[in-house]
Amino acid sequence: MLKEVDILLIALTSPIKIGVYENSKLIESIESEEKSSDILPIIFKDLQEKYRLQKLFYANGPGSFMAIKVAYIFLKSLSILKNIPLFATDAFYFNKNGPIKAIGKLHFVKIASEIKTQKLETAPEVIFRLPDVLDYNEFSTEAAPLYMIGAVGQ
């Protein structure tokens, strides 16, 4: 019998990161420098052979919109085909609310619960981390990408 797990995907930057969680605790992590559109089907095929997927989680932005779209379409398709619930939260959950590069000197920042763009002369390198324990309360069933973020520079 396969172990029941939840899967978390962070595909905002390279490398993509995937966490396997049992009872909300990280039991396996996977990183890949490959393009998410190429590697996600391979990784998830392996995961489905090894585990019984219960829930899917991902970072729905801000970040590379193309990477977010690929992740969303892939996970949403898997969610529908396999009847696995899909949940999302913003990327700030995975980088301790640090600024996230947008374009030029503009960065996405989260102030209170609002995501805005802000010009920063210098910003720390963005490092997204898989949490050791997944806090399910931080995620929502509203899993669509964060398209409501205004055009960069506005």
Descriptions of predicted regions:
Residues 43-55:
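Phosphate/pyrophosphate-binding loops at sites that engage ATP/ADP/AMP, CoA/4′-phosphopantetheine
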Residues 55-60, 66-86:
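DPxDG-like acidic metal-binding loop motif
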Residues 4, 42, 58, 70-72, ...:
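Residue-level detector of functional hotspots within protein domains
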Residues 38, 42-45, 72-76:
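N-terminal, well-ordered alpha-helical segments
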